[in-house]
């Protein structure tokens, strides 16, 4: 009981708005039925091959790049609550339309439009969490948001897998309803958009007149962080690209159900591991968490190459992968907000997201061609090689961070 109280107690005394955002994350994630199955929808329902799926993903990612820049600029210059609500309403409308029409390329286009507006609001959502916490409580605030997202995801992918064959239209409508419910929570209960901070890192001080380029030149380790994010995004993307394709090749349409179960296991392990890591390993620095997390992600995901048709091992590897995801997320979310002026959080977030999106989309196109020509074993090998590069970059970041931001280490 004492341990349970310790786990829950670490999330006490955060600002009320953080808890509202937490419940909003839960509700939204409960309706996230489409995105885990998107690759399988394109493959199984619409008949695209792996290369074409990767090309579609790359084109959509390229189209989102200017939206990321717009989202970052808006997050740094406009009311963040208004941005989130406006984008959510567009997302709801698109998902309702996609659910009401017969499944086709138009349905996918509507879903991608919805995802574009979700992309625009992303920097505002992340910056709002940072605005409502200070440097000391930020990791717990982000940890709570991450926990909420995965609480909602425990059943969503499994439900999506069950609806996949005959009731996919209903999955679109459930996604719309969940997003609308979350939006109403924000409209009604989010009143403050920032709080007085007890502790502000010197690196967070406002610098209104300084450009994004100047900040990146001045803090070059942030560019290295973006490269880690790029390689990491490509490797992590295989959870929703190569892995479901592999399941579909082994089990046919039933692969969607198996992948849905794996995704639910992912969410369940996050729920169990997040408070444990935050409570007992909270003193590990964010850059070290990144290194540990990326290493476990590479190990857990790449090992699927060696366990084809061994169902029990799928779930063991998913546990390893997910523990890595927890470390990575708890490291990367506070990283930038402690090292970047508050006036630039949105734009730097957009820059990192663009790098990540470019790596994952171009990488998936290459991987799709490799998969179509050489098969799954070679494709997984390519993921492993990229993973080695990722681990090296994450190690370099952890070693250079103290020199780049010495005051953060003096504060401990």
Model-derived features: where do they sit?
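Juxtamembrane intracellular "pre-TM" segments in multi-pass secondary transporters
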Residues: 1-15, 193-225, 411-412
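Helix-loop boundary and gating motifs at the non-cytosolic
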Residues: 7-61, 221-228, 232-253, 258
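Residue-level signature of mid-helix packing/kink "hotspots" within the transmembrane helices
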Residues: 33, 61-69, 153-154, 267-275, ...
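Conserved MFS/SLC helix-loop-helix module at the cytosolic interface between two early adjacent transmembrane helices
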Residues: 65-102
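Helix-to-loop junctions at the C-terminal end of transmembrane segments
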Residues: 67-79, 273-286, 371-372
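Structural signature of the two symmetry-related core transmembrane helices
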Residues: 82-96, 288-303
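Helix-loop junctions at membrane interfaces in 12-TM secondary transporters
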Residues: 99-111, 305-317
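Cytoplasmic helix-loop-helix junction between adjacent transmembrane helices
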Residues: 112-149
